[in-house]
Amino acid sequence: MVIGLLKTLVGSRNDRLLKQYRKVVAKVGTFEANLQTLDDAALAAKTDEFKSRLASGESLDSIAPEAFAVVREASVRVMKMRHFDAQLMGGLALHQGKIAEMGTGEGKTLTATLPVYLNALTGKGVHVVTVNDYLAQRDAEWMSTLYNFLGMKVGVNLSQMDHTTKKEAYAADITYGTNNEFGFDYLRDNMVQDLEQRVQRGLAYAIVDEVDSILIDEARTPLIISGQADDHTDLYIKINALPSHLELQIGEEKSDGTGVEKPGDYWVDEKSQQVYLTERGHDKAEEVLVQLGALDDGASLYAPQNITLMHHVYAALRAHTLYHRDQQYVVQNGEVIIVDEFTGRLMQGRRWSDGLHQAVEAKEGVAIQNENQTLATITFQNYFRMYGKLAGMTGTADTEAYEFKEIYNLETVVIPPNRISQRKDKQDQIYKSSRERYDAVIKDIEDCYQRGQPVLVGTTSIENSELIAGLLDKRKLPHQVLNAKQHAREAEIIAQAGRPKMITIATNMAGRGTDIVLGGNVGKQSSLIQVDEALSDLEKAAKIKSLQDEWQSIHDQVLTAGGLHIIGTERHESRRIDNQLRGRSGRQGDPGSSRFYLSLDDPLLRIFAGDRLRAVMERLKMPDGEPIEAGMVTRSIESAQRKVEGRNFDIRKQLLEYDDVANDQRKETYRLRNEVLESADIGELIANLREDVLRTICSIYVPLESMEEQWDLAGLEHALASEWGLKVDLQKWVEGSDSVDDVEIVDRVLEAAKESYDAKVDLSGRQSFAGFERSVLLYSVDTHWREHLAALDHLRQGIHLRGYAQKDPKQEYRREAFELYGELLNVIKNDVVKNIMTVEIRSASELDQAAESMNEDLAKLSDVQYQHADPDMEVAGSTGDRGAALDIQPAPVRSGPKIGRNDPCSCGSGKKYKNCCGALS
């Protein structure tokens, strides 16, 4: 009550921001009259003027009002579109590094041109991030006329582009591309063997379109570059037979032994999307695996040599119980193709990790492709936090405002619409069974069809969309299906979904990014007329006028019928996805309506509220086909959605807490790589590594501050000669000296090593040897880093078991990951020094060939795949330790001053930098 009173008196944070923006919008208006008097050349010259003012010390904020006015005037001249005041406010929010929530049809693409132009004036490059290649190319082509008029170059970064084209795209002032491609380019840039192979030029400012889809929905799906590992085809085929021999247990056994309705061999946790073997199931599985020839008689699944077998067993169980054809995946041309759970699109070329994809292939009887080895990986959370300034826009961000602030430090600003929506959102209708629900859906569609009202039916899976399509076929109702199986025409289909009597069935939010215009979109037809060389200008104008008049008549007809009607066949886990579906109707003040039809069989209701609602229906003796329709029930469903959203937020936050540990190590490894690439000569670095390694070797045989009786000079000589290729006659030297201490022995070894090194450099030439050293170091860093990623992955998958020992799994993961990284640095040091000390040089050309061979070995990327991992595999058993807290706060990654050798290490270990991650420097 007190908070509500304060908001009434002083306004909410959102109200206060909008008040500030309106003042700036008024300033933008003051420049308009003067700019209208300028010719095109003078208006375009404003770009150079702004750059000069910035170079003189002015800030972007000070020139923002005039720059926005210039963009608005240029847009009027070039594109015949003038930015509304609401779009100017959205542009200000984006410039300030906030998320602008703007409804469907409010012109987010045009809004982005304002902050994009302003920030591109710095010359550091602006990235505009979209969800797919089609939207990236469409928006870049659409807006490039405006940017080119103002003297800005536009690039498009698409998948499958060659290196030169990509580099040109990033060199442009403004670069459009997909979130995946920007992330993969970052990873690839940190795998190159030469500076010239990099394509990105820094991460200064990014605007993320459909920011909720990219930073929330896809935040649990890391980007992974992987290569194929060993072939286990026979094992997958054998273990695929196991699930059919096991029985499903109904109910989860509680600590007091209750909760099991029907005993079995495994049980499924639908909330966490995991499968677990029971005690009985372990014994049964061992017995069956022995029969299948996958396990030795008398051996245990828990034996160290069978750890990977256990991993295959769980992959097979998940494939059979949680992953279903035409829901999580489809089978096309003998391949298992993942279906995006958020958009319903096919994810060509993507594969689930940890053997799950192979288990599904074995289940479906298609060719099994090899498992993948991770070469590089990063989450969207950690990638996008590296930008100096990040902003986003979407029609549905407010429900996730807390997560945006908590994870990305992004504030959400709700921009008021240019025209108030007239859409009517009707109460949900809940039926006892799916059959009754679909009967009601078809009846509603039929009613709209008779009245000439267009309908958009939203489904959660391909299976459901095809079920509804089949029911409509039986009623002989014409319709179009938009799902992952045929998304090539999705933008065209969705653009025409507003025509009279049009029935469109869409999987989730397929076609997002394209407006549904009531009466249909005549833009494409108009553009075809414009490029028809057989027509004169007068004929073109007449045809376009006729087309627009016809459209206006159809538009009025649809308005009279009630606008676009939205039908939801199921509630999604997130209220935001439901709001996205509803938001397709009522654009720019158009009328419209929406209704969700639910059944007690829906997963959301079954898990959270099904039993209670079923009891109410039975108590009221409701006849078949009679729905429950009440505000209280709708609120109850939204409450269930909040629980799921909260749980999903916990999972994403937990993934980030784990990934932050790996991210610190990734940054340090990439920093070392870049230092090696950017240095003209790494001789000093190699000398430091050599000294560090040899001092450690000497201390084993000749301990520090030790007596001569404790020395093992013969052992040291043998170790140096056999392992490090260094012959030093220490015993004779000590016998011939009056007094020698341990320090002098170490100095003698270091001097001998330097003489051997200098002789190799003299023989090959400094330039050739420097190239060889660089190749050796990069080869060692890259190969061992890949092994380290696999080690971290295995550590993460089993770390939840530490909870049973009353230990915090996250703290244990952090501690052990740090120890693993320390081991990695030592292995790299020893590997590099050993390779350089033991190499036998006969000529410079031989050395060049060796370096070239190593570079080629690292660059063999023909079998590399770019994919999202299955988010559920990322934190094994994550629900069990969600409450445990990690004592580090996720921090934005920023470039800063160089860390001093005696400063605390950035990885959080508490050690000095020189004794931790800086050991290689």
UniProtKB/Swiss-Prot annotation:
Cofactor: Zn(2+)
Cellular localization per UniProt: Cell inner membrane; Cytoplasm
UniProt: ATP binding residues: Q87, G105, E106, G107, K108, T109, D515
Keyword terms: ATP-binding, Cell inner membrane, Cell membrane, Cytoplasm, Membrane, Metal-binding, Nucleotide-binding, Protein transport, Translocase, Translocation, Transport, Zinc
A Gene Ontology term for the protein's cellular component: cytosol
Keyword DNA repair in annotation: no
Superkingdom of origin organism: Bacteria
SUPFAM superfamilies membership: Helical scaffold and wing domains of SecA, P-loop containing nucleoside triphosphate hydrolases, Pre-protein crosslinking domain of SecA
Topological type in the membrane: Peripheral membrane protein
GO molecular function: ATP binding; metal ion binding; protein-exporting ATPase activity
Region of interest (Disordered), residue spans: 872-901
Cofactor annotation comment: May bind 1 zinc ion per subunit.
Biological process terms in GO annotation: intracellular protein transmembrane transport; protein import; protein targeting; protein transport by the Sec complex
Catalytic reaction(s) noted: ATP + H2O + cellular proteinSide 1 = ADP + phosphate + cellular proteinSide 2
Binding site for Zn(2+): C905, C907, C916, C917
EC numbers on record: 7.4.2.8
HAMAP family: SecA (MF_01382)
Assembly: Monomer and homodimer. Part of the essential Sec protein translocation apparatus which comprises SecA, SecYEG and auxiliary proteins SecDF-YajC and YidC.
Family in the record: Belongs to the SecA family.
Function per UniProt: Part of the Sec protein translocase complex. Interacts with the SecYEG preprotein conducting channel. Has a central role in coupling the hydrolysis of ATP to the transfer of proteins into and across the cell membrane, serving both as a receptor for the preprotein-SecB complex and as an ATP-driven molecular motor driving the stepwise translocation of polypeptide chains across the membrane.
Identification of the protein by name: Protein translocase subunit SecA
Organism, as annotated: Polynucleobacter asymbioticus (strain DSM 18221 / CIP 109841 / QLW-P1DMWA-1) (Polynucleobacter necessarius subsp. asymbioticus)
